[in-house]
Amino acid sequence: MLNFLRRSLQILVLTILGGMATQAMAAETTPAQQLSQWSAAAGQPGRAEQGRVFFNAKQGGEWSCASCHGTAPTQQGKHASTGKVIKPLAPAFNPQAFTDSARVDKWFRRNCKDVLSRECSAAEKADVLAYLISLKP
């Protein structure tokens, strides 16, 4: 009986610790930290108005960021070709937005290549994120 209780306690502790580790990993960065990183790489702070213009402008092709994320990135968007629903991009409306640097890097790389036919510069990322952070309920 003692071994059973000891084993049950070990399983419970591991389950709790595993859940805490998963939560910590899911939010390993913040939008403000991402903005700081890209601003430093760009050598200038992110500019919200420049980010708004960039976000809504078609960049030589058929699409803009707003084509999928919506002109109001405070609401759900919809992928222009697949129709897949996209969560709000503005951090105040989606607490998970910009909290996983690997996902952020992956999606910026993919989406910038779709919209611009190249990767976004650090300044462009900083501007867009400054704009998204500026959007409040």
Where are the regions a protein language model picked out?
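Bacterial N-terminal signal peptides that target proteins for export
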Residues: 2-12
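N-terminal signal peptide c-region/cleavage motif recognized by signal peptidases
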Residues: 21-23
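Electrostatic cytochrome c docking/interface patches
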Residues: 27-59
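Stable alpha-helical elements in mature extracytoplasmic
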Residues: 47-50, 64, 100, 104, ...
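The canonical Cys-X-X-Cys-His
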Residues: 60-72, 128
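Short cysteine/histidine-rich zinc-coordinating motifs and their immediately flanking basic loops
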Residues: 77-84
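Short microdomains enriched in Cys/His and/or Lys/Arg
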Residues: 87-102
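C-terminal capping alpha-helices of c-type cytochrome domains
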Residues: 105-137
